[in-house]
């Protein structure tokens, strides 16, 4: 009898056939044919091994190329389950505003928050600050990837909400989108949300220039630790309802300390380097 035949006979002797529930439960998760149906539009169910491979591959890829938003998004979803995204969902359920957000399911796009309206708001309002930041950085709220690798539909929305609120965090803190600013914000987000991807992103400091690295560890990482530990859960902020609120007042309410202005620091460094270069040329 062949090896396959002996294995089949052994299974039959124990009452197990390829069609039996015990075997099907083992085989089904690893079969593309038997992959469970999606639980919401765009959902891609993954096996444990597939999720692990996605987590490792996307983490390495995003470290090599921090501008790959798709890899960063995939890493965030693959590493958020099974615990961390549920913790964030539970934080919303335990908060009155968080529960309203989960019930209403608002989305942040250029249609739900028209730029013309945001630009018309008072100068120091949350909405005007958000619009000014978007204009300065040249980004749009419509560029966020849709969640697809989180199985629970409600948790998928929580991740989508975090993702779409990310630019509000940028605007309130004033941090820019280049690598140094993103690292500072990700460190802050990790201590506020505990989403693993935000913590893993910090390792991208190896891509910083020596001066940027020194600045990150001496200025912005300490800021991220202070504000991240002291601040309230940002996932429970209903941004759409506070667009006219004074942004300084909001920072005080959320216990967010404004970090050193990276753009001003860089500008001062360039001016200093220019003056030093001119001085050396005059001495030559």
From Swiss-Prot:
Enzyme superclass (EC): lyase
GO cellular component term of the entry, any: extrinsic component of mitochondrial inner membrane
Binding-site list for Zn(2+): 166-167, 170, 182
Function recorded in the entry: Lyase that catalyzes the C1-decarboxylation of 4-hydroxy-3-methoxy-5-(all-trans-polyprenyl)benzoic acid into 2-methoxy-6-(all-trans-polyprenyl)phenol during ubiquinone biosynthesis.
Quaternary structure and partners: Component of a multi-subunit COQ enzyme complex, composed of at least coq3, coq4, coq5, coq6, coq7 and coq9.
Family: Belongs to the COQ4 family.
Protein name as annotated: Ubiquinone biosynthesis protein coq4, mitochondrial
Organism expressing this protein natively: Aspergillus clavatus (strain ATCC 1007 / CBS 513.65 / DSM 816 / NCTC 3887 / NRRL 1 / QM 1276 / 107)
Origin organism lineage: Eukaryota, Fungi, Dikarya, Ascomycota, Pezizomycotina
Underlying gene: coq4
């Amino acid at each position: 009898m062949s090896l396959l035949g002996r294995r089949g006979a052994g299974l039959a002797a124990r009452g197990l056939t390829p069609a039996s529930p015990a075997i099907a439960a083992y085989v089904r998760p690893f079969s593309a044919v038997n992959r469970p149906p999606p639980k919401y539009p765009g959902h891609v169910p993954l096996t444990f091994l597939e999720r692990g491979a996605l987590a490792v591959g996307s983490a390495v890829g995003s470290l090599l190329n921090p501008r790959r938003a798709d890899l960063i998004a995939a890493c965030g979803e693959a590493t958020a389950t099974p615990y961390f995204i549920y913790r964030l969902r539970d934080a919303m359920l335990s908060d009155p505003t968080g529960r309203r957000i989960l019930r209403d399911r608002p989305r942040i796009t250029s249609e739900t928050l028209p730029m013309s309206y945001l630009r018309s708001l008072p100068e120091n309002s949350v909405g005007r600050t958000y619009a000014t930041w978007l204009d300065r950085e040249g980004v749009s709220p419509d560029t966020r990837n849709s969640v697809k690798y989180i199985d629970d539909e409600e948790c998928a929305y929580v991740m989508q909400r975090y993702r779409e609120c990310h630019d509000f965090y940028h605007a309130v803190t004033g941090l820019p989108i280049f690598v140094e600013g993103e690292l500072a914000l990700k460190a802050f987000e990790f201590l506020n949300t505990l989403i693993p991807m935000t913590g893993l992103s910090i390792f991208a400091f190896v891509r910083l220039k020596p001066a940027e690295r020194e600045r990150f560890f001496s200025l912005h990482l300490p800021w991220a630790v202070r504000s991240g530990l002291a601040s309230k859960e940002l996932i429970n902020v209903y941004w759409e309802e506070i667009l006219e609120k004074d942004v300084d007042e909001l920072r005080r309410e959320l216990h967010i300390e404004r970090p050193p202005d990276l753009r001003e620091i860089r500008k001062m460094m360039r001016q200093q380097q220019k003056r030093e270069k001119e001085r050396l040329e005059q001495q030559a």
